[in-house]
Curated annotation (Swiss-Prot):
Domain of life: Bacteria
Keyword Thylakoid: no
InterPro entries the record matches: Ribosomal_uL5 (IPR002132), Ribosomal_uL5_bac-type (IPR020930), Ribosomal_uL5_C (IPR031309), Ribosomal_uL5_CS (IPR020929), Ribosomal_uL5_dom_sf (IPR022803), Ribosomal_uL5_N (IPR031310)
Quaternary state and interactors: Part of the 50S ribosomal subunit; part of the 5S rRNA/L5/L18/L25 subcomplex. Contacts the 5S rRNA and the P site tRNA. Forms a bridge to the 30S subunit in the 70S ribosome.
Keywords: Ribonucleoprotein, Ribosomal protein, RNA-binding, rRNA-binding, tRNA-binding
Similarity field: Belongs to the universal ribosomal protein uL5 family.
Gene: rplE
Protein name: Large ribosomal subunit protein uL5
Any one GO BP annotation for this protein: translation
Function: This is one of the proteins that bind and probably mediate the attachment of the 5S RNA into the large ribosomal subunit, where it forms part of the central protuberance. In the 70S ribosome it contacts protein S13 of the 30S subunit (bridge B1b), connecting the 2 subunits; this bridge is implicated in subunit movement. Contacts the P site tRNA; the 5S rRNA and some of its associated proteins might help stabilize positioning of ribosome-bound tRNAs.
Keyword Ribosomal protein: yes
One GO CC term on file: ribonucleoprotein complex
A molecular function (GO) term: structural constituent of ribosome
């Protein structure tokens, strides 16, 4: 199932070497980790909602997420310090490549009116962040068993030094970009 890992080792490394003429094999950019974050604003009023988000994120990532807590109190949002407000999971190694493969091949084609990602989503240091508006694009989520549609933020952290290197790397994994 780790076709993307083999794709990276066999084809993407060679194309990166040709494009950017790296002298050392450790200079070649690679994906370090993928962080999936799900903010659950409704958890302020109902603490049971966070459990549903945890279950969804566990099914999507194949790994148990950690609950994120509020750092400080904000009265206008009725938010107190250390209140549960979301969950996140960090994927590395084989699970990371497995998730990326499912994202590109299965989930992104199921997103409504999806044209591709903007190049503006890079942060200047080679990392790429985007959001999905609904968790039901993943086949692991059963539409009948969810309580509400939730979005998520996905950050792909790379070892690339520039956005151009990172764009070339992620394009090798068939991530669709427009511009």
């Amino acid at each position: 199932m780790l076709r993307f890992k083999e794709l990276y080792k066999q084809k993407i490394i060679e194309s990166l070497k040709k494009e950017f003429s790296f002298k050392n094999k450790h200079e070649i950019p690679k994906i370090k980790k993928i962080v999936i974050n799900m903010g659950v604003g409704e958890a302020i009023a109902d603490s049971k909602v966070i459990n549903n988000a945890l279950n969804d994120l566990t099914l999507i990532s194949g790994q148990k997420p950690v609950v994120t807590l509020a750092r400080k109190s904000i009265a206008t949002f009725k938010l107190r310090e250390n209140m549960k407000i979301g969950c996140k999971v960090t994927l590395r190694k084989d699970r990371m490549y497995d998730f990326l493969e499912r994202l590109v091949i299965v989930a992104l084609p199921r997103v409504k009116e999806f044209r591709g990602f903007s190049y503006k989503s890079f942060d200047g240091k080679g990392n790429f962040t985007f959001g999905l508006k609904e968790q039901i694009v993943f086949p692991e989520i059963n539409y009948d068993k969810i309580d509400t549609i939730r979005g998520m933020d996905i950050t792909i952290v790379t070892s690339a030094k520039t956005d151009q290197e990172s764009k070339f790397l992620l394009s090798g994994f068939n991530l669709p970009f427009y511009n």
